[in-house]
Amino acid sequence: MYLISIDRIDLERLFQFELASKPASLFKENGEARYTKSKSVIQRKLKVDVSSRTVSKPDVAVIDGGGMLHAAIYWPTEGIVKDLIDGIEKYVCSFINFADVYLVFDRYFEFSIKSDTRTERINSLLRAHTLSLEGPLPRKDTCMSSNETKEQLINIISKELSDRMRTKKFTHKFVVTSKQPVPVETQYGQMSERVDLKSDYDEADYIIPQQVNAAINENCQSIFVICIDTDVFLLLCHHFFTRKWTSNVNMKDFTSDTTTITCIRSTVERHQAIIPYLLACHSLTGCDTVPNLHNIGKSKALSCHQ
């Protein structure tokens, strides 16, 4: 009001913008927030892919646990929970023979900043299943459509994998992040808490870049982030630029036969003029926790910056 009174704000110009004149465009007709369905557009337009043959094996692999489950690395059509964990163990061991492995899962807190988004994604009509290691494994869509079932599954996977890695006595680290604030590390048959990686945030999207940064601080020179999430991509670009990382950080999907990976260094170098503005651009045009304005999407926002 003060700025208006001294003619620092032109009201006529201000009300040309949708956010000022039509705040209801942030919401659907039923009152729910309007979350974007196409946030990956910004990643597809900006990422720089390179041949996987030109990249050496990593020192560290950071795996998005939720993405791994959605990708169904190994999901038995019929079987028990243990069968699923057997397949996940095989996948993790494909990295841990030559690299430290950080496996990061989402946490499911009530009334968190992500609650609305998760509620919109799940089917509230599906009942929760009670899971156990030797109990029957529900279908993938059933598990992944219930937060309660998914949380049980994550807890079982995290505990069972840590126990198995302890018996194998790998020389490389296996660090799993699940419900507890402090991740658990297993190495040389010993388990310990990684207090330095403590986090109270519920989103793996935030935790993954944090753990990448921790690995870089330990002088790791090559890091693979096995994840296809747009939020993670943008956060990695942001941290690479602002923290001036010198290590090689690459993103790849969950299939072993992919011929290309996304190079964060090359992406930042190509788009360094707009990297400082990407997080704000992404947020204002809609992300997991921020509704988007009608007809103002990623492409339109990027065209304003480029």
Regions found by a protein language model. Name each.
Residues 1-306:
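Noncatalytic, typically N-terminal accessory segments of nucleic acid-processing enzymes
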